[in-house]
Amino acid sequence: MSDTTKMELFTARVCPYAHRTRLVLLEKGLDFELIEVDLQNKPERFLQVSAYGKVPALVHDGVEIYESAIINEYLDEVFPEPSLMPRDPRLRAQARIWIDYCDGHFLSDHYAALKNQDQAKNAAWKDKIDAHLRRIDQGMRDLSPDGPYWLGPSASLLDFAYYPFFERLPAWAHYRDLGLPDDCTRIRGWLTVMAERPSVRAIANPPDYYIERYARYAAAPAAAE
């Protein structure tokens, strides 16, 4: 890659959003420089690229982009092979709806449940997270009953948007008993297939890594801000 098209990804190993974009870059077979950001001591150049001070952030051909969902669509448009979004505009819309559900609903509750310090509310949070997971499971069945991916036989940006959070689920199970309900069999089958993808295997972390890194989230709400 020439200097004019050099690609840099600002990331943090622990971050599920950055994990998404790393998966897409690997799926595309793209060359890029990985810049690990200390989230407790963010470098000035990173803050110049990422207006929100969050990872991931991408620099490519003079363009600075942040927010994982936006970065991933950019990558799929600029580097169209292999395509990670369906050609059917109706399915593309469904993919975006479910990615928005992940970012705007599922994850906000997921992290709130992890940071909850009131044991009297644990059961209510568990019910809420289980409801999210069952909704996701049903959404997978509705879009592609046989899978193995969200939208059918091929992986898409939708799969890579969700997978990093499921890889981190052991931390939620460890601290708040928030695991995958037994009846979410569509998700279980999807996870098995996703875990075997070379891109996923290349950057996977063991459960103990996430349990250790998410301890501060589970300890107290203020510590995780």
Regions found by a protein language model. Name each.
Residues M1-L151, A218-A224:
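GST-like domain detector, emphasizing the conserved glutathione-binding G-site
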Residues G152-R176, L180-G189, M194:
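GST superfamily/GST-like fold recognition
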Residues R197, A202-I203:
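A late-sequence structural motif
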